[in-house]
From Swiss-Prot:
Belongs to the class I-like SAM-binding methyltransferase superfamily. rRNA adenine N(6)-methyltransferase family. RsmA subfamily. Pfam families: RrnaAD. It comes from the Bacteria. InterPro entries: KsgA/Erm, rRNA_Ade_diMease-like_C, rRNA_Ade_Mease_Trfase_CS, rRNA_Ade_methylase_Trfase_N, rRNA_adenine_dimethylase, SAM-dependent_MTases_sf. The keyword DNA repair does not apply. It comes from Salmonella paratyphi B (strain ATCC BAA-1250 / SPB7). GO terms for cellular component: cytosol. Signal peptide: none annotated. This is Ribosomal RNA small subunit methyltransferase A.
Length: 273
């Protein structure tokens, strides 16, 4: 039997499809999401409706974003979900979540079992809409969740950690084994909750500057910042900010990255592109 077929649908590798089928795991995720009637719930990648059905049971309306044409068509004709659903058959990377929030009249509650091949770029896309999002619950590769929650001085800490924690409070919810999926992925999975900060703990003047600094620092993470960021900061400037030039990218806190970004915004602002 082909273990890529589930409920009559052949999982497409190019869409990174792995379908959740463990009832205990599904119930645990739905409990963590705790959907309520009247909320603007949005699911990314509903697939074969493993989460869509139990979430939809609790709601009058549910918005879903599904790239796979066949799966979108199945949802359209779903016996009890169909009338409740607003289906966008498109790539979530092209979705304007700000416009969607405005249409629905409130901040979005976004959830989904995300395709692992696009999870990181999709996170960055969603971070740009955090003012339109109340919270997010995602199933991700466990290694990605570890990176999202990691603090300084750890191997998992990187650009994704800094940017996620700049925008959101990041809370691990539960770990999920490969056996909970069809076909089973080759990696462990985990569910994470991301809650955009109501008030930014470390506001930056220009997010593009923070993005540039973290990219340059972590692209050369084995170098000291004296070297990796030497084109942006002198040793004297780093020292004045209380940042040791001998530290590496992984030793610098989110607050310190934001401090560096604001210094650069004030003293060498990026030109408008």
């Amino acid at each position: 039997m082909n273990n890529r077929v589930h409920q009559g649908h052949l999982a497409r590798k190019r869409f990174g499809q792995n379908f959740l089928n463990d009832r205990f795991v599904i119930d645990s995720i739905v409990s963590a999401i705790n959907p309520q009637k009247g909320q603007a719930m949005v699911e990314i990648g509903p697939g074969l409706a493993a989460l869509t059905e139990p979430v939809g049971e609790r709601l009058d309306k549910l918005t879903v974003i599904e790239l796979d044409r066949d799966l979108a068509a199945r949802l359209q004709t779903h016996p009890f979900l169909g009338p409740k659903l607003t289906i966008y058959q498109q790539d979530a990377m092209t979705m304007n979540f700000g416009e969607l929030s405005a249409q629905l009249g409130q901040p979005l509650r976004v959830f989904g079992n995300l395709p692992y091949n696009i999870s990181t770029p999709l996170m960055f896309h969603l971070f740009s809409y955090t003012d339109a999002i109340a919270d997010m619950h995602f199933m991700l590769q466990k290694e990605v969740v570890n990176r999202l929650v990691a603090g300084p001085n750890s191997k998992a800490y990187g650009r994704l950690s800094v940017m996620a924690q700049y925008y959101c409070q990041v809370i691990p919810v539960l770990e999920v084994p490969p056996s909970a999926f069809t076909p089973p992925p080759k990696v462990d999975s985990a569910v994470v909750r991301l809650v955009p900060h109501a008030t930014m703990p470390y506001p930056v003047k220009d997010i593009r500057v923070l993005s540039r600094i973290t990219t340059e620092a972590f692209n050369q993470r084995r170098k000291t910042i004296r070297n990796s960021l030497g084109n942006l900061f002198s040793v004297e400037t780093l020292t004045e900010m209380g940042i040791d030039p001998a530290m590496r990218a992984e030793n610098i806190s989110v607050a310190q990255y934001c401090q560096m970004a604001n210094y650069l915004s004030e003293n060498a602002p990026l030109k408008e592109s």
